[in-house]
């Protein structure tokens, strides 16, 4: 798939892994299509060493691609294998690509972790179209979520030794990263030497994507990766420092997606100073896909009103008067990252689908005594409800309106 579309052509081909990392809509509405994407990524675009192309160059052009792997895209694809398996309950799908999943995760552990201390610190290409250096929580949080998901899949497949290895790496890495990066309020970036030795870093900044891996872990039923109080502090700091009720005098020399009296969430800010001379290029921009994933993260951590305020901010900009309400723009129209919006729905309903273990549950964050919402799995869709019966007990029900044969 394209990332977006221009007026005469598509924008950025090849189902870019680090952009589709955010998208939740297709997996929940067209799950077999997402399975096909994972098959392409692991069976076609991952080489014998486990390095994955973050664009489907082999599938589209029939030739290798001499480009860095993307840390967030590659590790996110492993997480999405877990998501697709949980949503569908399709063991054959998992077994078909499992060897390449193992290869991709082992490659990540060796390629980006220079001293094998379970913390990624190498040159990390990412969704901002640059490389981060040193230790940052964007790549590492996705790494630990991928290790935790990998351990669960390995255990299910009977690979107990591998499962224990990855689980130990995840636990050790989470503890070490938290100790290295948490500054008492949020997770920063640490590099060797002066932050300005490298272009396009963020250092002491409050990155909106700093806990992307944690949000994905919540969406996919993996729970907290880091101390809960630290996570709550960090996600609230993102709202506190990066959300602007009006852009006003905010200065940006990059693309403009929010103006003047419009609200929006910046990709990064430096509340205590320390802004690099050349921070990553998009840091002053507003991206709807990141706004939605932060909103979902806030809702999961109990900041319901703050999460909904960010969603309302997006929709106030795309109100049908100033902008097309069905076309949220980033690098092109109808941008794929915006499909992070479905994650907000699942955060509000608390939907968790685990078909390999025959489980579908909800944990609503709103209207707990009288809740109803759309739900979907890999085999059916319908209406889920939670309500109190005459005795005051909470009852959940799932009314399937469609079930696949």
Protein language model regions, located:
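Repeat-solenoid scaffold signature
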Residues: 156-205, 213, 218, 222, ...
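Substrate-binding cleft of carbohydrate-active enzyme catalytic domains
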Residues: 4-169, 174-177, 219
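Amphipathic alpha-helical scaffolding segments
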Residues: 99-103, 234-237, 312-316
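Short, well-ordered loop/turn and helix-capping segments at boundaries between secondary-structure elements
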Residues: 31, 87-90, 156-159, 179, ...
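Extended glycan-interaction surfaces of carbohydrate-active proteins
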Residues: 1-8, 32-68, 110-135, 178-287, ...
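Active-site-proximal structural scaffolding
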Residues: 15-19, 70-77, 101, 136, ...
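Non-catalytic C-terminal accessory modules of carbohydrate-active enzymes
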Residues: 258-261, 277-280, 284-285, 291-405
């Amino acid at each position: 798939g394209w990332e977006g579309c221009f007026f005469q052509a598509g924008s950025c081909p090849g189902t870019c892994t680090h952009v589709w990392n955010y998208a939740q809509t297709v997996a929940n509405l067209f799950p077999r299509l997402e399975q096909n994407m994972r098959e392409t990524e692991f069976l076609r675009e991952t080489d014998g060493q486990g390095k994955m192309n973050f664009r489907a160059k082999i599938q589209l052009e029939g030739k290798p691609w001499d480009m860095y792997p993307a840390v967030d895209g590659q590790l996110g694809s492993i997480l999405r294998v877990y998501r697709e398996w949980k949503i569908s309950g399709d063991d054959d799908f998992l077994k078909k690509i499992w060897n390449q999943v193992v290869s991709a995760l082992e490659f990540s552990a060796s390629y980006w972790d220079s001293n094998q201390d379970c913390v990624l610190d190498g040159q990390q290409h990412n969704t901002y179209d640059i490389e981060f250096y040193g230790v940052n929580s964007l790549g590492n949080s996705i790494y630990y979520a991928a290790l935790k998901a990998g351990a669960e899949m390995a255990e299910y497949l009977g690979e107990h030794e591998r499962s224990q290895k990855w689980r130990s790496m995840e636990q050790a890495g989470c503890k070490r990263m938290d100790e290295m990066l948490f500054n008492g309020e949020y997770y920063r970036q640490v590099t060797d030497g002066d932050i300005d030795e490298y272009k396009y870093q963020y250092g002491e900044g409050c990155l909106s994507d700093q806990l992307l891996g944690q949000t994905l872990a919540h969406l996919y039923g993996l729970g907290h990766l880091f101390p809960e109080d630290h996570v709550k502090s960090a996600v609230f700091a993102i709202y506190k420092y990066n959300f602007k009720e009006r852009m006003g005098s905010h200065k940006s020399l990059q693309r403009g997606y929010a103006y003047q009296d419009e609200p929006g969430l910046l990709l990064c800010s430096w509340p205590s100073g320390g802004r690099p001379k050349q921070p990553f290029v998009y840091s002053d921009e507003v991206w709807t896909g990141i706004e939605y994933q932060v909103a979902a993260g806030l809702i999961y951590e109990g900041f319901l009103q703050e999460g909904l305020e960010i969603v309302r901010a997006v929709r106030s900009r795309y109100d049908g008067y100033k902008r097309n309400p069905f076309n949220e723009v980033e690098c092109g129209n109808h941008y794929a990252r915006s499909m992070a919006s479905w994650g907000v729905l699942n955060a509000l309903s608390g939907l968790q689908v685990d078909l390999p273990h025959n489980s579908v549950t909800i944990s609503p964050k709103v209207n707990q005594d009288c809740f109803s919402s759309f739900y979907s799995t890999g085999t059916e869709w319908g209406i889920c409800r939670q309500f109190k019966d005459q005795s005051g007990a909470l009852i959940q029900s799932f009314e399937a309106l469609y079930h696949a044969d």
